[in-house]
């Protein structure tokens, strides 16, 4: 059975990483590192392992199994049916507008025909950027928090800001009317996990950032758990599609839109081949989820259609 130590070692490592990420997740520093390491990393050795087993003429099946498991974990095999939806929600980390202009960003946002737009890192660096951007988005009302902005062309029934503990970021909670029914939209941007020198055994940064993220995620979960009726949670959640935090969002809100109606890996942070921008919905069904291939930020926008 174990005709190739290399092939089986690779396959067992990939399976072990997936199992530990799901079962233990962020409960320990080592497994948190596994959760937040881009899934594409575990796919990188696959070509070499396959070539080695083909050359040795042994262990090819095991190497292929490990490759398929790694490709599945990276989202490369993901493919869901898609149809048009009546409600369009866009989330986009705009990186303070440093890689774009009001004209370019405004044109992009208009082209999506989104009913609701959730922006993160919307504390624009250039003076007057936000005013010029809004001038290019007629018909949208704006709700601002520190570093987050929600725009909508739907009637706004209520709006509030919620502070994270020990942080300057704010969660925006906007209630709009859609088809005569109240719909709550939560725009969130929890902080990222800070690795520091954790791979070398220095946990001085990662432990506090794990605690900070846990507190921030609890804030978001408290918000969505207190709301009733249809709800969309979206934003740069700095959370890969595995691990404890990801499962908490699904349990509290509902399915991940990309899982339901996306195709391909959905990498919204292409520099690290990572999917960390999400939308989760309750009382709505995602019919199409698309990561837009644009270069106006280090993130890519996620556009989801719902019915």
Describe the residue ranges of each PLM region.
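Acidic/histidine-rich helix-loop elements
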Residues: 91-101, 194-210
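Glycine-rich, phosphate-binding/catalytic loops in enzymes
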Residues: 106-108, 133-136, 202, 249-252
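N-terminal, active-site-proximal structural segment of metallo-dependent hydrolase catalytic domains
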Residues: 1-132
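Active-site beta-strand/loop signature of hydrolases that rely on acidic residues for catalysis
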Residues: 34, 88-94, 105-129, 185-188, ...
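Soluble or luminal CAZymes and related metallo-dependent hydrolases
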Residues: 100-101, 166, 208-219
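Structured beta-strand-rich core segments of catalytic domains in phosphoester-bond hydrolases
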Residues: 70-82, 94-96, 101, 116-193, ...
């Amino acid at each position: 059975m174990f005709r190739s130590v290399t092939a089986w070692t690779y396959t067992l490592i990939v399976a072990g990483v997936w199992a530990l990420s799901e079962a233990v997740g962020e409960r320990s520093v080592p497994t948190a590192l596994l959760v937040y390491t881009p899934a594409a990393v575990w796919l990188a050795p696959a070509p070499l392992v396959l070539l080695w087993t083909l050359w040795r003429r042994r262990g090819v099946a095991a190497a292929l199994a490990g490759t398929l498991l790694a490709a599945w974990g990276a989202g490369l095999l993901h493919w869901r049916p898609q149809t048009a939806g009546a409600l369009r929600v866009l989330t986009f980390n705009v990186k303070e507008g440093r890689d774009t202009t009001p004209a370019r960003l405004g044109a992009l946002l208009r082209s999506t025909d989104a009913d609701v737009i959730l922006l993160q890192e919307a504390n624009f660096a250039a003076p007057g950027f936000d005013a010029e951007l809004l001038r290019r988005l007629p018909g949208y009302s704006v709700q601002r928090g520190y570093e987050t902005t929600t725009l909508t062309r739907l009637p706004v029934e209520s709006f509030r800001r919620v502070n994270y503990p020990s942080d300057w970021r704010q969660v925006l909670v906007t209630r709009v009317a859609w088809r005569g029914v109240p719909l709550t939209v939560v725009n969130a941007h929890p902080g990222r996990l800070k690795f520091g020198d954790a791979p070398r055994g220095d946990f001085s940064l990662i432990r506090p950032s794990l605690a900070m993220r846990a507190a921030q995620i609890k804030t978001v979960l408290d918000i969505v758990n207190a709301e009733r009726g249809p709800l969309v949670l979206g934003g740069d959640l700095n959370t890969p599609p595995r691990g404890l935090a990801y499962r908490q969002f699904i349990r509290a809100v509902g399915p991940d839109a990309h899982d339901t109606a996306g195709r391909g890996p959905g990498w919204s942070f292409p520099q690290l081949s990572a999917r960390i921008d999400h939308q989760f919905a309750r009382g709505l069904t995602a019919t199409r989820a698309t990561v837009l291939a644009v270069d106006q930020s280090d993130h890519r926008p996620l556009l989801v259609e719902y019915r």
